[in-house]
Amino acid sequence: MVYQIKDKADLNGQLTKASGKLVVLDFFATWCGPCKMISPKLAELSTQYADTVVVLKVDVDECEDIAMEYNISSMPTFVFLKNGVKVEEFAGANAQRLEDVIKANI
């Protein structure tokens, strides 16, 4: 399942609910072409790994404070968290790397 974050409190609540699972934070922008291209693959992976992965989308224009907290400078950027700790991060719409990082961390 892919869930779009509304604000910092929403993010904190979702991170608490996702305890024990791999969390993929997808920092995107509605005007970002590569973000739109990778979105279907991310949705597919979230369904494929629904028991072990939670995907949280963060619109950098709506949630600037969260983007700043994670030092996001380009989109899409994927931040991978396990039990609240960052285990990986990369920028770019690389579907194979996205799947590889998920597989390596579940």
Curated annotation (Swiss-Prot):
Disulfide bridge map: C32-C35
Active site: C32, C35
Site (Deprotonates C-terminal active site Cys): D26
Keywords: Disulfide bond, Electron transport, Redox-active center, Transport
Keyword Disulfide bond found: yes
UniProt cross-references to InterPro entries, sorted A to Z: Thioredoxin, Thioredoxin-like_sf, Thioredoxin_CS, Thioredoxin_domain
Molecular function in Gene Ontology: glutathione disulfide oxidoreductase activity; protein-disulfide reductase activity
Start and end residues of each Thioredoxin domain: 2-106
One GO term of the biological process aspect: cell redox homeostasis
Site location (Contributes to redox potential value): G33, P34
Cellular component aspect of the GO annotation: nucleus
Classification via Pfam families: Thioredoxin
Functional summary from the UniProt entry: Participates in various redox reactions through the reversible oxidation of its active center dithiol to a disulfide and catalyzes dithiol-disulfide exchange reactions. As a reducing substrate of peroxiredoxin 1, thioredoxin 2 is preferred over thioredoxin 1.
Similarity comment: family membership: Belongs to the thioredoxin family.
Protein name: Thioredoxin-2
Organism of this sequence: Drosophila yakuba (Fruit fly)
